[in-house]
Curated annotation (Swiss-Prot):
Subcellular location: Cytoplasm
Cross-referenced InterPro entries: Chaperonin_Cpn60_CS, Cpn60/GroEL, Cpn60/GroEL/TCP-1, GroEL-like_apical_dom_sf, GROEL-like_equatorial_sf, TCP-1-like_intermed_sf
GO biological process: protein refolding
UniProt cross-references to CDD domains, sorted A to Z: GroEL (cd03344)
Subunit structure: Forms a cylinder of 14 subunits composed of two heptameric rings stacked back-to-back. Interacts with the co-chaperonin GroES.
Catalysed transformations (reactions): ATP + H2O + a folded polypeptide = ADP + phosphate + an unfolded polypeptide
Entry EC number(s): 5.6.1.7
NCBIfam families per record: GroEL (TIGR02348), PRK00013.1 (NF000592), PRK12849.1 (NF009487), PRK12850.1 (NF009488), PRK12851.1 (NF009489)
GO MF annotations in UniProt: ATP binding; ATP-dependent protein folding chaperone; isomerase activity; unfolded protein binding
Organism in which the protein naturally occurs: Clostridium perfringens (strain 13 / Type A)
Name this protein carries in UniProt: Chaperonin GroEL
Amino acid sequence: MAKTLLFGEEARRSMQAGVDKLANTVKVTLGPKGRNVILDKKFGSPLITNDGVTIAREIELEDAYENMGAQLVKEVATKTNDVAGDGTTTATLLAQAIIREGLKNVTAGANPILIRNGIKTAVEKAVEEIQKISKPVNGKEDIARVAAISAADEKIGKLIADAMEKVGNEGVITVEESKSMGTELDVVEGMQFDRGYVSAYMVTDTEKMEAVLDNPLVLITDKKISNIQDLLPLLEQIVQAGKKLLIIADDIEGEAMTTLVVNKLRGTFTCVGVKAPGFGDRRKEMLQDIATLTGGVVISDEVGGDLKEATLDMLGEAESVKVTKESTTIVNGRGNSEEIKNRVNQIKLQLEATTSEFDKEKLQERLAKLAGGVAVVKVGAATETELKESKLRIEDALAATKAAVEEGIVPGGGTAYVNVINEVAKLTSDIQDEQVGINIIVRSLEEPMRQIAHNAGLEGSVIIEKVKNSDAGVGFDALRGEYKDMIKAGIVDPTKVTRSALQNAASVASTFLTTEAAVADIPEKEMPQGAGMGMDGMY
């Protein structure tokens, strides 16, 4: 296909127009008084959102060169979202500012490669200073503040803080759409997996159709149990001990199933059988997780295990087990805490090593089940449009909270960036164009606070000067129009989000400045359609 080419200033200006179109659309959402953007959807109602990356993903421009610029900045938002889960609007805004300031200097004759070196040096210094002013997250109150700022809603902040308190920092919190009007929290403590009882005759509560076992023993095997003779020696020991039994096996069928059900109905002893969760290698890993949690052993042919030789000390234990038609929940497994910790660390190492999104999700689920539980935030609203908007806000708040727990918090509202300006401005370079790069970052660091003020209908430059001349940590609360200590006021941003936004913006923007030629496809002209033939009298 034939290509069209642009060079030098013309190429950069065309791409900058695309950058500005995308960034100007996204940046109206920044801050407590930021507005929303409405996105047309081919199917269903339009989506109203203030999530930077969601807006950026929707933007495709007709002009090929403008679209190239827009796609580059979209990468800034996407990468920041992948790393930190929030801060995508800030990252887009910073990229626009660095590109704008950089292009002025490139047009004036500065060398873009040297400018890039200066930008890199300044960003490294800024990140170092941001980490110095970072404070660790202390308790539920800090978590609630981070989530409330991200979602612009104190109720959501409290809800996420409750969820994290219940499932722990390693626990999994998912966001789902609710059929009711309100937003609520549903917590599943302990380990739950999607396998129910193999026979309805095993239930202990016929009204709720569920089996609840207190202080049961847990038999874990990857074998199919069909011959009752394999189980008899173990069952006799369990009956003598007066214990209840949960069997997790590949399957329970035939004679074994009949015997277990008959004994349950006669009241000889209580036993519930469930199929092992997962498939293939994942099933083996999940059975090992259950064994670690309950302090049992997986009886498997792979390690020479035989059901006939199984003893009580091979079985796991738990405080309680609840089995429904669809799921099994093991609460407070009696496994060795040191072994559980080692298993958790092992899964974390696998998480770091894998590149598959699917594997990551499954490993994260396993981690949560071992480390505490799963919380589900059920989002409710009056209309589908409001529901989608709320769900995106909560997902952002959740990501921001996890980022804050990981690396700590800094003063919010763009204050952290303004606070590090003085230290970055002290950097000097003998090479003039590198110094230009440093100065570009110094100016760009003001941009988030300026935009937050602008979205609140105020003059950003005046506010920035006042914050610069105030004590460290003092910023501008755009919601109330007051200057205050941001951390004490609970206006905070996660360090990871603040750092990632700047690093990703600088990475893409500085590379953008080095562009000297742009190549794009020549758009195909549509051929005019021919006139229709007359078909009078034909039906």
